A protein has these predicted regions:
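N-terminal alpha-helical interaction blocks
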Residues: 2-76
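Residues immediately within or flanking Cys/His clusters that coordinate Zn2+
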Residues: 50, 80-85, 104
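Amphipathic alpha-helical "recognition" segments
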Residues: 70, 82-86, 98
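Short cysteine-rich clusters marking metal-coordination/redox-active sites
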Residues: 83-89, 107-110
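Basic, alpha-helical nucleic-acid-binding regions used in initiation and control of genome expression
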Residues: 87, 91, 97-98, 102
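Cys/His-rich microdomains that often coordinate metals
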Residues: 91-93, 113-114
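Cysteine-rich micro-motifs
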Residues: 100-113
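Long, charge-rich boundary regions
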Residues: 115-165
């Protein structure tokens, strides 16, 4: 695990305060999210799946999703819609808004032609805001070859043979 990138204390504090005002959370929710933002590896803060996060911190799916939606609203995270190839774990596109998604695409990795199905090949993910913590995955030109091809370009919910992505 690499050394965590620095945190903008002011923005983190403001965001957590706004998040705490958004609704009443269980007592451990905001301290656990703060710990996650401060100490997680850069890759763990890139394209976070709120359901997976919730299972790690004993938070229901509904509460985990609500936490990340509110966290995006207050600027702690940014929400993205990822278009995933149906045949490999390639992220074919990352969109802030669904109206940018085209009905058909060709995968740059496996060359397969894909018809977009919103319920099957779209993932909603959250990445820590660059103002809060500027992770290396926001700078793909600085990634190692392995990180660029196997972590940046692939969905972290897929796998490539024996290599977990």
């Amino acid at each position: 695990m690499s050394v965590p990138s620095p945190v903008n204390e002011s923005l983190l504090s403001q965001g957590l305060g706004a998040l705490g005002s958004a609704r009443s959370w269980a007592s451990n929710v905001l301290p656990e999210l703060e710990r996650f933002i401060r100490t997680a590896d850069d890759y763990d803060l890139f394209r976070v799946n709120p359901i997976q996060y919730g299972s790690l911190v004993d938070l229901s799916e509904a509460d985990a999703i609500e936490l990340f939606v509110h966290a995006a609203k207050v600027g702690l995270f940014e929400m993205d819609w990822l278009l995933i190839c149906a045949y490999c774990p390639q992220v074919a596109g990352s969109f802030r808004e669904l109206d940018q998604v085209h009905p058909r695409f060709q995968c740059a990795f496996c060359n397969a032609i894909n018809d977009v199905a919103l319920d099957d090949y779209i993932q909603v993910t959250f990445t820590v805001s660059s103002g809060v913590r500027d992770i290396i995955f926001r700078h793909p030109e600085m990634l190692s070859v392995e990180d660029f091809y196997l972590r940046y370009n692939f969905s972290n919910l897929g796998s490539l043979g024996d290599i977990e992505v």
